[in-house]
Amino acid sequence: MPERTMVRVDEKQLPRWTRWLDLGDRLLAVLLLAPAAILLSLIIVYPVARLVYTSFFSLSLTSGLPAEFIGFENYTAMFDDPIFWETTWNTVLITLITVPGALFMGLGLALLANLPFSMQWPMRLSLLIPWALPLSFAGLIFAWFFHYEYGVVNDVLNRLGFEGIIWFNSPNWAFAAICLTIIWKTSSFMALMILAGLQTIPRSLYEAADVDGAGKIRRFFEITLPLLKPSIVVALIFRTITALQTFDIPYMMTGGGPGTSTTTLAMYIHQNTVSFLDLGYGSALAVVMFALSMCVTAVYLRIIRTKD
């Protein structure tokens, strides 16, 4: 069979009508992408740009004064604001506790839901319940669960012979209750993401491992976990970003109390913009939270590229 050779042809040597056809294809691609690009700009780019712009102004609706350009004063004021540092630390701490907690709990639930048994669908259906519940509704439910007099948690403790805990009067216990609620609420998302990854692992790999005499633990660490890496990383990125923006559950359970011990950065932004109507400082806080989320995403992506 004769060998085929590839000949590179200069675009200038092609007929003019073929060059116009190629230009038409490019123009068509631009026209098809234009609506999505415009919509993305209206939904994301413009609000972020407007947020950054407003953060350089002193804009308080309660003062009745017009907006005044003050440069970076809103940002420098954060360094002298103890509540900013406390709420930022609370947000970081919630992220460090709830993201790994939801990951381990979600991994266990996904492995359980992936087991081959006859009643598999109720297990998988139950994973959707926490995920489908609105965050504010979950906060209200667990606020009742942890209620000192009528809560289910204290009722169980009393039946076991322990004294009930006044959960929301103590900063530490209130913080623990919020973290437990967030882990319960978000572990189902982790489980669904990991379960989707488990479904893509070829069964032949496990059969080959059985032939080689590999045990369950070895199969998990050498087959399951490495192949789940893409699903886990995507879930971690989404979950970390949402953890840094935690608002609904602590707002509904404690309102940020006692004091500001459970107030998150998102709640502090809401307080400044909605309660105090200080749009300038609130916008600066929101820019910091946005930058923090982008930094975390960049770190995750850098880790992925380094390991690959």
From Swiss-Prot:
Keyword annotations from UniProtKB, A to Z: Cell inner membrane, Cell membrane, Membrane, Sugar transport, Transmembrane, Transmembrane helix, Transport
Purpose: Part of the ABC transporter complex SmoEFGH involved in sulfoquinovosyl glycerol (SQGro) uptake. Responsible for the translocation of the substrate across the membrane.
Gene: smoG
Domain called ABC transmembrane type-1: residue spans: 88-300
GO biological process: transmembrane transport
Membrane topology: Multi-pass membrane protein
PANTHER family tied to this protein: BLL4140 PROTEIN (PTHR43227:SF11)
Family: Belongs to the binding-protein-dependent transport system permease family.
Keyword Cell inner membrane annotated: yes
Complex and partners: The complex is probably composed of two ATP-binding proteins (SmoE), two transmembrane proteins (SmoG and SmoH) and a solute-binding protein (SmoF).
Coiled coil: none
Record-given protein name: Sulfoquinovosyl glycerol transport system permease protein SmoG
GO cellular component: plasma membrane
Localization, UniProt: Cell inner membrane
Main localization of the protein described in the UniProt heading: membrane
InterPro entries to which the protein is assigned, alphabetical: MetI-like, MetI-like_sf, UgpAE/MalFG_permease
Transmembrane segment boundaries: 28-48, 92-112, 126-146, 164-184, 223-243, 279-299
